[in-house]
Every structure is written in C-alpha cells, then in structure tokens.
Amino acid sequence: AGALALALWGKVDVQVFLNGFHTPFQDTFWVSVTAMGGTVFCLCVLLAGSIFSYRYMVSGIVSILCTMALVALLKHAFDAPRPLTVLTQAGVWDSIVLVEGHPLRDTLSFPSGHTAAAFSLFTTLALFATRAWVKTLLFLAALAVAYSRIYLMQHFLSDVLAGSFLATVISIAVYLWARKARWIDFGRPLVSLRRYGRPENPE
C-alpha cells in the first residue's frame, strides 16, 4: 500500500497529507514511540532477553549490527535530503505542523535507521514467538516506530519502507542461521523457557 501511494502521489504529497493529522496528544505519543527505534534501546532489550535465551540475544544483536551497518553505508551512498530540505525547496514547508522541541535533520534520509533497528528487533522477536497475538503486537510495534519517523518529519514514506524491508530480510536470514548454530548455546539462561511451555533450544 505504501509503495502504491508513492507511485500515485509521490513522496512530497504523501508527506504533506500525513502531516495533516497532528494533535497535541499524538505529538507526545509519537516522540515516545520513536525511542523504540534507537539502536541502544534495541540492544538493551536483547540483552535483557538473554535471561530467557542466549539464542534470542545473539540472533537479535547480529541482525541489528548487520542491518545498521548496511543502513549506514546506504545513507552515505545516497546522501538523500530529509523532509526539511525537500519540502522547503517544494515551497510547502511553511504549511507543515512540527513537534515542538524535536530537532530536525536535513541529510542522510534514506533509508530510515530507526525504522530498520525497530524492524530488526521486533522481527527477530516475532520469529521466535510462538503465539499469533504476540507476533501481531510485535509487528504493530515496528509499524508504529516507522510511522513515528514520518509523523516527526524525520523521514519520507520511501525511507521507512526501505528500512523495514532491509531489516526484515536480514533478520529472517540471521534467524535461519541462528536456529542451526549450536555454539550459540554457551550456557544455561537465568530463566528456563520450559516454564513457559517451549524448549530452550528450538531445532
């Protein structure tokens, strides 16, 4: 749907349209949500998860590091301008509603790093999760971070689509590798997953 919207209306018109839904509550809410896309936050979640499974932790950390390395390379390769620059040049910046106190950047827009980190984290967790409702919540959390980057005028829809795609592909690849890497099980976690009805080392 996002790719279709970009094809039909272009990233500037899509950005201006989505900017029309600002409210004071959402300003505060999306600033909080976007923090879940920070690399430090994601790594802390995975380190905390190691009390349940080292496999989760290693898979997630490898996924995030690989994803963010590729994102950094692409950011500097494309050096794409952010909404601040593009919308100013398009003559529509004066009509844009901004979140007060949230600083804006003007370069290295493509792809979105926060979106990539969030999708890397939540995709990894979803792949290991066994319950459908948990997978759904994790997917919605990743989508929320992606939307927050657009809401806060940090990225275009194309940026978050690229970040989410790269992270998802890398996370799936790392997950498939981690399921077969026996050396990852280098110790017993603090909390046994058997208490929660599933094996600690899935095959």
Predicted regions and their residues:
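N-terminal transmembrane-helix/juxtamembrane module of multi-pass inner/ER membrane proteins
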Residues: A1-C44, K75-L104, P202
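Aromatic-anchored segments of alpha-helical transmembrane domains
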Residues: A3-A5, W9, C66-L73, A141-M153
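Hydrophobic alpha-helical transmembrane segments
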Residues: A3-A7, V45-F52, L125-F128, Y147-Y151
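Membrane-water interface at transmembrane helix exits
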Residues: Q15, S50, V71-D79, A126, ...
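Membrane-helix interface segments
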Residues: F25-Q26, S53-M57, T130-T136
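Hydrophobic, aromatic-rich alpha-helical transmembrane segments
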Residues: T28, S53, M57, I61, ...
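Interfacial segments of alpha-helical transmembrane regions
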Residues: V45-L73
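Membrane-embedded catalytic cores of phosphoryl/pyrophosphoryl-handling enzymes
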Residues: W93-E203
